[in-house]
């Protein structure tokens, strides 16, 4: 999946910029610049055509209805024809194709609900919340709870202290046993568990999330993620999941548990895996820094994101949440269908601060899980870059 490409980088945060050729990976020690950008968010916005910020209710619904049509078509074909296949081998071929296709389209719908949480679906907040709540509830995501924590992520991106998800640990806080999990077989196991269980574990137990010093969950109204006035929204989110659970229970009683697992359960696992893979690779790269409170600011932190190429078909299925993530972090209320045009315009201002990596996705995932184990500031960073940067943390993997 994905094309070939390169990411513009700086070595150790200073010195001449080295462009990698097509198909090449990042060499050891190569890093993006961590200097404060010489432009403002308003300058970036002025470079983008104004119509890119306009939300169209009709156009947004057209993407949603297209996804619903595909989900319905895949379901109809699987439920109506798969049991008629003449040879058992065809069953083993047909079901994985269905699971992947259905899970991929559901990921696109998940992305539309995510846009609703950013008020990027329409000009009407109520419409956005109703649409987002219905979609996310049907795929077991607590809409308002996630909307709140995700807003915090956008407000604190790349802060080693305050970011909400995929927060890297310093070396001193790595589990003692992790050094035994750096071999290839263990890494395969970790990737598998992360993709299949990572999303529900994050929502339920805040695994890989910001450390709050006590139990944290998207389902707990008293969780430190939420303010007292937001607790009612957590209850509403949970009610949506209870309603979905009851609906699935009734379906299982009518159709059978096996039927429900095949038609809904496995595609849901594929959806969860896609969400984890996409979001992890948007913010994780061996060349990326994290900042503590002495170095972090909003623009600097939100520029530590990378666009990736999943290929023209999957980029379209995922509504380009994959290859327009940089501009999404800068302008989260921009509708996804304007992201490509806005990215082209923004790159003229961003220059070397825009990051794109065309490494094939599975190769990139393997590299990131291997190289991005923990973060530490460089002992000689000040001497290398000409300024004290002890608040800048870089990925390492030697335990």
Swiss-Prot record:
Q: Where in the cell is it found?
A: Membrane
InterPro entries according to UniProt: FA_desaturase_dom, FAS_N, Fatty_acid_desaturase
The catalytic activity of this protein is classed by the Enzyme Commission as 1.14.19.33
Reaction it catalyzes? a (9Z,12Z)-octadecadienoyl-containing glycerolipid + 2 Fe(II)-[cytochrome b5] + O2 + 2 H(+) = a (9Z,11E,13E)-octadecatrienoyl-containing glycerolipid + 2 Fe(III)-[cytochrome b5] + 2 H2O; (9Z,12Z,15Z)-octadecatrienoyl-containing glycerolipid + 2 Fe(II)-[cytochrome b5] + O2 + 2 H(+) = a (9Z,11E,13E,15Z)-octadecatetraenoyl-containing glycerolipid + 2 Fe(III)-[cytochrome b5] + 2 H2O
Q: Where is this motif: Histidine box-2?
A: 150-154
* Membrane topology recorded in Swiss-Prot or TrEMBL: Multi-pass membrane protein
The top EC class is oxidoreductase
Which UniProt keywords are present, listed alphabetically?
Fatty acid biosynthesis, Fatty acid metabolism, Lipid biosynthesis, Lipid metabolism, Membrane, Oxidoreductase, Transmembrane, Transmembrane helix
**What molecular function does GO assign, one term?**
oxidoreductase activity, acting on paired donors, with oxidation of a pair of donors resulting in the reduction of molecular oxygen to two molecules of water
Q: Does the keyword Transmembrane helix apply?
A: yes
Q: Which superkingdom is the protein from?
A: Eukaryota
Q: Which family does it belong to?
A: Belongs to the fatty acid desaturase type 1 family.
Report the domain remarks.
Answer: The histidine box domains may contain the active site and/or be involved in metal ion binding.
- Give the function comment from the record: Converts linoleic acid to alpha-eleostearic acid (18:3(9Z,11E,13E)) and alpha-linolenic acid to alpha-parinaric acid (18:4(9Z,11E, 13E, 15Z)). Converts a single cis double bond at carbon 12 to two conjugated trans bonds at positions 11 and 13.
- What's this protein's name? Delta(12) acyl-lipid conjugase (11E,13E-forming)
Instruction: Specify the species.
Output: Momordica charantia
Gene encoding this chain?
FADX
């Amino acid at each position: 999946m994905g094309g070939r490409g390169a990411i513009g980088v700086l070595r150790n945060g200073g010195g001449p910029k080295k462009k990698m050729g097509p198909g090449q990976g990042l060499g050891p020690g190569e890093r993006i610049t961590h200097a404060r950008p010489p432009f403002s968010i308003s300058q970036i916005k002025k470079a983008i055509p104004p119509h890119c910020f306009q939300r169209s209710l009709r156009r947004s619904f057209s993407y949603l209805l297209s996804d619903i049509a595909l989900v319905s078509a895949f379901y109809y074909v699987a439920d109506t024809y798969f049991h008629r296949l003449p040879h058992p081998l065809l069953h083993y071929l047909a079901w994985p194709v269905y699971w992947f296709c259905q899970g991929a389209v559901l990921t696109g719908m998940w992305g539309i609900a995510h846009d609703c949480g950013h008020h990027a679906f329409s000009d009407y907040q109520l419409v956005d919340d109703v649409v987002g709540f219905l979609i996310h509830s049907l795929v077991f995501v607590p809409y308002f709870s996630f909307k709140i924590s995700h807003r915090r992520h956008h407000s604190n991106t790349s802060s080693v202290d305050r970011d909400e998800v995929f927060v890297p640990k310093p070396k001193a806080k790595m589990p003692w046993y992790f050094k035994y999990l750096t071999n290839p077989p263990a890494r395969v196991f970790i990737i598998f568990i992360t993709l299949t269980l990572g999303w529900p574990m994050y929502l339920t137990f805040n695994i890989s999330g910001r450390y709050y010093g006590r139990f944290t969950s998207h389902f707990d109204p008293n969780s430190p993620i939420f303010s007292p006035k937001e607790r009612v929204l957590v209850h509403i989110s949970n009610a949506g999941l209870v309603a979905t659970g009851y609906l699935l229970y009734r379906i299982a009683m009518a159709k059978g548990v096996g039927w429900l697992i095949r038609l809904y359960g496995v595609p849901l696992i594929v959806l969860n895996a896609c969400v984890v893979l996409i979001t992890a690779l948007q913010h994780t790269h061996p060349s990326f820094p994290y900042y503590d409170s002495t170095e972090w600011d909003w623009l600097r932190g939100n520029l530590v994101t990378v666009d990736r190429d999943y290929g023209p078909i999957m980029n379209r299925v995922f509504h380009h949440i994959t290859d327009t993530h940089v501009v999404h972090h800068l302008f989260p209320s921009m509708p996804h269908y304007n992201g490509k045009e806005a990215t082209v315009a923004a790159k003229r201002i961003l220059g070397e601060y825009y990051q794109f990596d065309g490494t094939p996705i599975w190769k990139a995932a393997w590299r990131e899980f291997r190289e991005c184990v923990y973060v530490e500031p460089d002992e000689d960073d000040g001497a290398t870059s000409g300024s004290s940067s002890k608040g800048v943390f870089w990925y390492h993997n030697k335990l």
